[in-house]
Amino acid sequence: QLPGVTTFQSDGPMPVIQKYHPRNAVSFVGGISNGVQGVSAMEINRAGIKVRKSWIFMDDYVLCLGTGIQADSNLVVTTALEQCHRKGDLKVLQNGIWNQISNQWHAVSSEQRFFHNNVGYITWGDSTSCVAEVAQRSGRWHDVMQMYRPQSVTSDVVSIYLEHGVSPKDKKYQYLI
């Protein structure tokens, strides 16, 4: 999962990157910046998923918005907030207390707050389904791009993502980093 990407959730192997990549069927994309703050937006219609996304970049936060999420598939559609090597504890705010997440935490509520490696994440909205987890993962960069050596790498990984469900219709999200 790459942060900010809305895609199908699958445990299947990643496709090997070839010379040809399916292109976005929509050409709407743009942004503006004063060098410190900025706004960008794009519409995506690619690989069976449609979504409109925008980002507002400020001095100390990024507001991420998505709307019109839809797909026709039997796979769950997710949007990743974060996936990185674990550096310290992943914490969730519950009833005013920061609690450590040691495995997987899943909740459906109007607001969730997380903290990892000096970065805070806030999700909110109507019944947002959010998953946060710390898990040991193994893989080979060679499986993604064959220019890398075929050796396995193992690491503790922090993942935070929103679940939009199977075959979502007009779903949306909003989160702050």
Describe the role of every protein-language-model region:
Residues 105, 110, 117-128, 141:
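Long, contiguous C-terminal modules that act as interaction/assembly or targeting platforms
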Residues 1-105, 110, 119:
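Catalytic and substrate-binding regions of extracellular carbohydrate-active enzymes
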Residues 89-91, 123-125, 131-134:
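Short helix/loop capping segments that flank catalytic or ligand/cofactor-binding pockets
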Residues 130-177:
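Beta-strand-rich recognition/accessory modules
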